[in-house]
Curated annotation (Swiss-Prot):
Record pathway: Cofactor biosynthesis; coenzyme A biosynthesis
Protein name (Swiss-Prot/TrEMBL): 3-methyl-2-oxobutanoate hydroxymethyltransferase
Annotated source species: Saccharolobus islandicus (strain L.S.2.15 / Lassen #1)
Biological process according to GO: coenzyme A biosynthetic process; pantothenate biosynthetic process
Binding site for 3-methyl-2-oxobutanoate: D45, S46, D84, K113
NCBIfam families from the UniProt entry: panB, PRK00311.1
HAMAP family assigned: PanB (MF_00156)
Superkingdom of source: Archaea
Cofactors, names only: Mg(2+)
Enzyme Commission number(s) of this protein: 2.1.2.11
């Protein structure tokens, strides 16, 4: 599989080939993904919750994102690597936003993703002008869950729906190459997808987007809580627990290590 580029990503919208994206946070996972046909890896700030054990993504730092982006990039996957910009790494001013986006690219990402709507237009323009591809993110934006009143579906009111449409158009105009739409009503995501010339990637927003993204821990059945919009394709949590328990039994009953697991001196 050859390296997926921004141009390939955008082309998939015109050819109506669905885009596939998953999160990854470490070298072993990225190495496994590199041997699949997945289109894109998101080094998501969701690592704060599924890797670092925080209650939300607000505690994730640039240092965290750089470290995990480097780990993923070391696997040299052909997939397009997109790295999340963490909370307060791009909101303060455009100068720091460009600097932090550049640090993620230097760490190995092919593009960055940031949350927010029309209020992020100038920031997006500045980062794109600096030569860094930007993916947008609207709908439920986890870094803004306090302002949104919690983790909820966005677009219930006419005002919210109109704002989502406006946000998507403003972000496209600002230069984003793709847009994540999270936890909105399916008809809204469909309208946005039809209006935009750039590909949309859904998570919890229905089947009419140009692609889908999931947190890999949800897909693998590793999460303590799986959102309603995620699907677990295997229960790795159970498989891992069973393996650990079998190891404990084998050690306690002197069934491990076996002869092939150690060396004896020759007599």
């Amino acid at each position: 599989m050859k390296k997926v580029t921004i141009r390939d990503f955008i082309k998939k919208k015109s050819t109506k080939e669905k885009i596939t994206m998953l999160t990854a946070y470490d070298y072993p996972t990225a190495k496994i993904i590199s041997n699949t046909g997945l289109d894109s890896i998101l080094v998501g700030d969701s690592l704060g919750m599924v890797v670092l054990g925080y209650a939300n993504t607000l505690n994730v730092t640039m240092r965290d994102m750089i470290s995990h982006t480097r780990a993923v990039a070391r696997a040299n996957p052909p997939q397009l690597i997109v790295a999340d910009m963490p909370f307060l790494s791009y909101e303060i001013d455009t100068k720091s936003a460009i600097k932090n986006a550049g640090l993620l690219v230097k760490a190995g990402s092919d593009a960055i993703k940031l949350e927010g709507g029309e209020e992020m237009k100038d920031t997006v323009k500045a980062i794109v002008k600096a030569g860094i591809p930007v993916m947008g993110h609207i709908g439920l934006t986890p870094q803004r869950f306090l302002r949104l009143g919690g983790f909820r579906t966005i677009g219930k009111t006419k005002q919210e729906e109109d704002q989502l449409i406006k946000d998507s158009l403003e972000l496209e105009d600002a230069g984003v190459f793709s847009l994540v739409i999270e936890n909105t009503y399916v008809d809204i995501a469909k309208r946005i997808t039809e209006k935009l010339n750039i590909p949309t990637i859904c998570i919890g927003a229905g089947p009419y987007c140009d692609g889908q993204v999931l947190v890999i821990n949800d897909l693998l059945g590793l999460s303590e809580f799986t959102p309603y919009f995620a699907k677990s394709y295997v229960n790795l949590k159970e498989i891992i627990s069973n393996a650990i328990n079998q190891y404990i039994i084998d050690v306690k009953n002197n069934k491990f290590p076996e002869k092939q697991h150690y060396k004896e001196r020759e007599s």
